[in-house]
Swiss-Prot record:
It comes from the Bacteria. Belongs to the YqgF nuclease family. The keyword Cytoplasm applies. The lineage of its organism: Bacteria, Bacillati, Bacillota, Clostridia, Eubacteriales. InterPro entries: RNaseH-like_sf, YqgF, YqgF/RNaseH-like_dom, YqgF/RNaseH-like_dom_sf. Could be a nuclease involved in processing of the 5'-end of pre-16S rRNA. SMART domains: YqgFc. It is an enzyme of class 3 (hydrolase). Pfam families: RuvX. It is found in: Cytoplasm. Keywords: Cytoplasm, Hydrolase, Nuclease, Ribosome biogenesis. Its EC number is 3.1.-.-. Disulfide bonds: none annotated. This is Putative pre-16S rRNA nuclease.
């Protein structure tokens, strides 16, 4: 099953997709946001192209674990995506993913201009990879529990 990860911002949406086995995430696009209908259509095309069966939206949380107004906006966007594209949407804690993406790009010695072009896509990769790793860990834990009983 292929999963899509989204880092939704006010100006751009970073997009990543998993491999068919759901092991690794790859960045595929940064959508420059315009109108909501255009954003949804662009996502629809990517869902179709990559045969995506589930979407994970990064959900911004405060460092104390609470949700702010941005999280509410992401949930509204995710609900629209789910309704209009007829695909399940999950949410994943995106705390510090953009910071981690920036640090990775700086360590890679990318120029500020190049970092700006790819940071949202890399943040989407981190959101999706963290989601898949957590799901794989839970599945392994469940399997281990079943075999020990």
């Amino acid at each position: 099953m292929r999963i899509m990860g989204l880092d939704v911002g006010d100006k751009t949406i970073g997009v990543a997709v998993s491999d068919l086995m759901g092991w690794t995430a790859q960045g595929v696009a940064t959508i420059r946001r315009s109108r909501l209908a255009a954003d949804l259509e662009h996502l629809r095309e990517l869902v179709k192209t990559y045969e995506v069966e589930r979407i994970v939206c990064g959900l911004p949380r405060n460092m104390n674990g609470t949700y702010g107004p941005r999280a509410e906006g992401i949930r509204k966007f995710g609900s629209l995506v789910e309704k209009k594209l007829n695909i399940p949407v999950d949410y994943w804690d995106e705390r510090l993913t953009t910071v981690a993406a920036q640090k990775t790009l700086i360590a890679g010695d990318l120029s500020r201009a190049k970092r700006k072009q790819v940071v949202d896509k890399l943040a989407a990769v981190l959101i999706l990879q963290n989601y898949m790793d957590a799901k794989a860990h839970l599945a392994a834990k469940e399997q281990s529990k079943e075999t020990s009983e």
